[in-house]
Amino acid sequence: MKLLVTGAAGFIGSYFTRYWLEHHPADEVVTLDALTYAGVRATVEELAGHPRHRFIEGSICDAAVVGQAMAGCELVVHFAAETHVDRSITNAAPFLRTNVEGTHTMLRCAAQSGVRRFVHMSTDEVCGPIVEGAHTESGPLRPRSPYAASKAAGDLLVFAHQETYQLPAVIVRCTNVYGPRQLPEKFVPLSITNALEDRLLPIYG
């Protein structure tokens, strides 16, 4: 099988790519990443020359690039996104472009190319605060930041493409992930480093 992984130079995407290549020896993996500040070029360089991996540097907002990357792929795993809450509050424009326009481009190309499965990586931030009990898959979306709103819009675009174009898609809503190679600005490493340095811990909500 041939699959496309977007955002593969990012934290989760890079781990997923290495895992897939290791555990699916018959598969070919195409990765697409714009290599923004959040993309770690070293993760791409580690896979340079791998016989079953091909890297394309480009934006998910560019339909021509996406179409080239997606050609012949049966599975698309869409990690690419702007993901920092605080940055979205300062400047929401990149979040709207990547998380909404870029996701729409990905979905449109996937529907046209006839992929067998589109996996959209989202976030629990789209759900907002728990009013009562626990979040459910059918619960309302209550985004509380421009980042969360942009990801919620992406989720709704996925639902729309399922209904309108019968695109076989699933949404994965991650919560606070952490591990080696993560950017220090993210919540878990920031909390740990602040605690080690006797600085205030960030509290959201």
Identify the meaning behind each predicted range:
Residues 49-50, 165-168, 192-203:
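A short C-terminal helix-loop "cap" of Rossmann-like NAD(P)-dependent dehydrogenase/epimerase domains
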Residues 47, 133, 184-192:
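A glycine/serine/threonine-rich, flexible loop-to-helix segment
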Residues 1-177:
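N-terminal Rossmann-like NAD(P)+-binding domain of SDR-like oxidoreductases, especially those catalyzing
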Residues 152, 177-190, 197-199, 203-205:
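Glycine/proline-rich active-site loop of Rossmann-fold NAD(P)-dependent oxidoreductases
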